[in-house]
Amino acid sequence: MGFDFSTSKSKAKRQKRIEVRFASPLMGIDLSLKLEAEEKKKEIEGSKHSRENKEDEEHDASGDEDEQMVKEDEDDSSSLGLRTREEENEREELLQLQIQMESVKEENTRLRKLVEQTLEDYRHLEMKFPVIDKTKKMDLEMFLGVQGKRCVDITSKARKRGAERSPSMEREIGLSLSLEKKQKQEESKEAVQSHHQRYNSSSLDMNMPRIISSSQGNRKARVSVRARCETATMNDGCQWRKYGQKTAKGNPCPRAYYRCTVAPGCPVRKQVQRCLEDMSILITTYEGTHNHPLPVGATAMASTASTSPFLLLDSSDNLSHPSYYQTPQAIDSSLITYPQNSSYNNRTIRSLNFDGPSRGDHVSSSQNRLNWMM
């Protein structure tokens, strides 16, 4: 059996229509009121839903704004933190720079004090230097026996000595101390030999040239010769052997000591030293009297030296001539010229007279030039 639902539904609709037609007008009013109430409810519910949606939207919007505000606050706080850190770093750098500036200022003050101290020391030394220089000059004058006008400029001469000093001379300076003792022994031997020599002098040949003493107080004959010479010694015609050397006070150039070896037991000694004022001048001092005939090359100069005990020679041939038997008692200008040609006859001698061997004003003799023949 089959059930027809469509017919049943149509029947139900028909019945409702019939009921509606025969219903009273009051029933129609009630139905309309119900419909209106339902519509109002729906409207109210819709308005509520719309309000709720609006509130939700507003709430969401406010939440977004709050989040944005929070984010902005966080950004502001982070930026403030960065600014504070940068400011702190800048402050630390400024403090370090200030500390460095203070240390530099302290160093500058120290350096200024040192500079001021050095300037004061320099001024004191500059004030003391002339006094020291004067005292040195006075000591040198007392040592050389020179008065008044014979002042020596220590500074300029020291520079010249340093420039003109040869390496051999510098090597010889170091031997001075070890040879002083030997020199004293030689001087004692010389005193004994001179004592014997005085007794034997009468038996010697009268034609043999003798050495004239430069002062009456000395026992030995002593003659001083100054010659311009570049070598360590000048060739004076005799044979010599070096036995000592030392540096004298007031003259940095060493003084060399020689003895005559022409004959055994000859008491003649010579001392050789550079001049303090002019390093090109070689000062030779001869002491004693030869106990043998002189060589041919030495006789002429021996006779010349006997007439003028203090001589300055200016020779272009480095004094290949003769013998001189002397050292400087007083140092100053006397001049003999020797041309290279040995046959040249005219010689000029300018001699000086002195009051003593170690002191004196330099007074020229009345006969300044003596002409003599070879």
Curated annotation (Swiss-Prot):
Bias regions of kind Basic and acidic residues — which residues? 40-62, 161-193
Here the segments flagged for biased composition (Acidic residues) are 63-77
Gene Ontology molecular function terms on file: DNA-binding transcription factor activity; sequence-specific DNA binding
Instruction: Extract the ranges annotated as region (Disordered).
Output: 40-90, 157-201, 355-374
UniProt keyword list: Coiled coil, DNA-binding, Nucleus, Transcription, Transcription regulation
| Main location per the UniProt record | nucleus
Report the locations given in the UniProt record.
Nucleus
What does its record list under induction? Answer: Induced by potassium deprivation.
Q: Where is the composition biased (Polar residues)?
A: 363-374
Query: Function, please?
Result: Transcription factor. Interacts specifically with the W box (5'-(T)TGAC[CT]-3'), a frequently occurring elicitor-responsive cis-acting element.
Identify the PANTHER family for this entry.
Answer: WRKY TRANSCRIPTION FACTOR 36-RELATED (PTHR31429), WRKY TRANSCRIPTION FACTOR 9-RELATED (PTHR31429:SF54)
Name it. Probable WRKY transcription factor 9
Upper classification of the source organism reads: Eukaryota, Viridiplantae, Streptophyta, Embryophyta, Tracheophyta
